[in-house]
Amino acid sequence: MSRTRNLARPLALLALLLAAAALSACGYESEEKEVVEGEPVTLGELKYNVIFSRFLNPDDNEDSAYLIGQPTPPPGSAYFGVFFEVQNESEEPQTLAEHFTIHDADHQKFEAIESESLYALPFGGEVESQEQIPVLDSTPETGPIEGSLVLFELPASASENRPLTLEIPGPEGPAEVTLDL
């Protein structure tokens, strides 16, 4: 038997296995509910993506727009913003989560606070069919970060107790997003 023929059979088998693996992955979407900032997570019919998170400075011109109506944070604490894009790819309006929570490595929990800012994500609001939050051409969508804000007040020590994990409730259970702090 020739050397070429000896190699042909294993190569053909390898090609067949690779083709089968590629076909089985077609249309695959992850059901992962633990992601890192920048990776989308699907909850029900909504796809949430934390596009950016950071501490906010009330004395900064850009940040002051995110903090409209908020009092000066107490000593030892600071405002923290989590900026989202949420997609509804379904044929029906979908309801956004009504609350958001951050956990630190010491298992302390911090609840999101209401915001009067034009950039605020509307807790419990609706996302129309085939639409997104922030709505196209809206203030948050055209702003510097291009996302809707969920606001937290965190102790200054929170940055020392990393990772910070954002919990988003969903119809089949919560998702967790590890924030890039």
List where the protein language model places each region:
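Conserved functional micro-motifs across diverse proteins
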Residues: 26-181
